[in-house]
Amino acid sequence: METKPPIPLAVLVGIQTPDVDDIAHEASLAELGRLVKTLGYAVVGTVSQKREGTGAALLLGSGKLAELAALTGGTGVVTSMAPPPKSKARQRFEGAAEGAAPPEPDPDAARRPEFVIVDHELSPSQIRNLERATGAQVLDRTGVIVEIFHRHANTREARLQVEMARLKYVAPRLRESSGGGGRQQGPGAGESTLALDRRKIRDRLAELKTQLDAVQRDGDQRRSARRDQLRVALVGYTNAGKSSLMRALTGSQVLVEDKLFATLDTTVRILQPETRPRILVSDTVGFIKQLPHDLVASFRSTLAEALEASLLLFVVDASDPTYESQLEVTRGVLREIGADAVPSRLVLNKMDRLDPAARAALRDKHPDAIMLSAHAPGDVSALRDTLIAFFEAEMVEDTLVLPYAKQGLIGEIYESARVLSEDHDETGRVLKVRALPAAITRLKRSLAAR
């Protein structure tokens, strides 16, 4: 019978700086725990400390560092001379060499945490110091997010974007392997192993960029074809319920999981029941605080769905006590890509998780927000009506004359506009339509072309 490997264990580490209150600090650590769970690890402990900042070489004070090392089985010593923790094989070997009886097996030692996950971005030297002190592998928040993105990327574009971000994260954290600093390889005279590795990364990044540019050109062409269509983009913090709402609005079988970053690729579906003209709904990658800048830059083309949408729906988990800061993170990322000028509506999701008093307080605070549960058909139907009304206000009526020689364009007209009436005369079909001004302009251009 095949046995599954044990679930990796991890300890979380958080620093609470003076500008962060207790609620925000605890929420951030809880979010980090969910990120770690998404990686498939189990959180078995948390070490937290109030400090002025996160820039110190030791990160933690000596007492908290000792507490962390006790959990992981490390020495708690942070110096370049600190010996690495001895493996069980090394302990058995040294015990046999000295003729000593082997130590009694420690039932807890096998389950000591292999990972220390820090809720901040760390410098390479901080990572090395903590690894020496704890004997565990150290990941910072950025490293965890990059790894999750790497595992969840499905499309070619997403995989290319994530690999670029991952290499940019790894490059400054490379260091010489033990005994490797003196080796010289490669075409450059005196090129060390480290320099060679970094050069390989630079070459790979250049190769990835070329491939990504080609993929994105294809994506730009697809988006250009949808430019004058009715488009709604769901944007918001990760795990706010965007994919559940997407499924409810479109009837599509998009992935819905209680995991952070379950969706990395933009999905475009048609609002159901279908309208004329059709309304397209996009589900975009979720945001998170301290989202690595390289990941934001890498996903700029994916987020172009938000930039080019007619309407943004800011989907928020109303049951989360930190929803306001999550909303600000979303708005901040959209400002960064230039999408802050797109018309938007606030959608307070998961209202079914709140008691009547909390719901009333939210109504007072956000009187213009759309309040719903993605799992309540009545709420979803009301949102659909709101979307239709938004686009109706943007549409105009006009008359199109379709020559008999161009009857092949009738499908495009019915797809891009609502046909209110149809007559015939000696020139062709005379169609009274209602559509967005840009769509009517494009259709008239097509009809006038030879």
Curated annotation (Swiss-Prot):
Binding sites annotated in the UniProt record for Mg(2+): 243, 263
Principal cellular location given in the protein's record: cytoplasm
Residues making up the signal peptide according to the UniProt record: none
Cysteine pairings via disulfide bonds: none
Keywords from the named record: Cytoplasm, GTP-binding, Magnesium, Metal-binding, Nucleotide-binding
Cofactor: Mg(2+)
GO cellular component: cytoplasm
Gene Ontology molecular function, alphabetical: GTP binding; GTPase activity; metal ion binding; ribosome binding
Residue segments, region Disordered: 79-110, 173-196
Every Hflx-type G domain range: 230-395
Subunit structure: Monomer. Associates with the 50S ribosomal subunit.
Function: GTPase that associates with the 50S ribosomal subunit and may have a role during protein synthesis or ribosome biogenesis.
Name of this protein: GTPase HflX
Biological source species: Gluconacetobacter diazotrophicus (strain ATCC 49037 / DSM 5601 / CCUG 37298 / CIP 103539 / LMG 7603 / PAl5)
The gene coding this protein: hflX
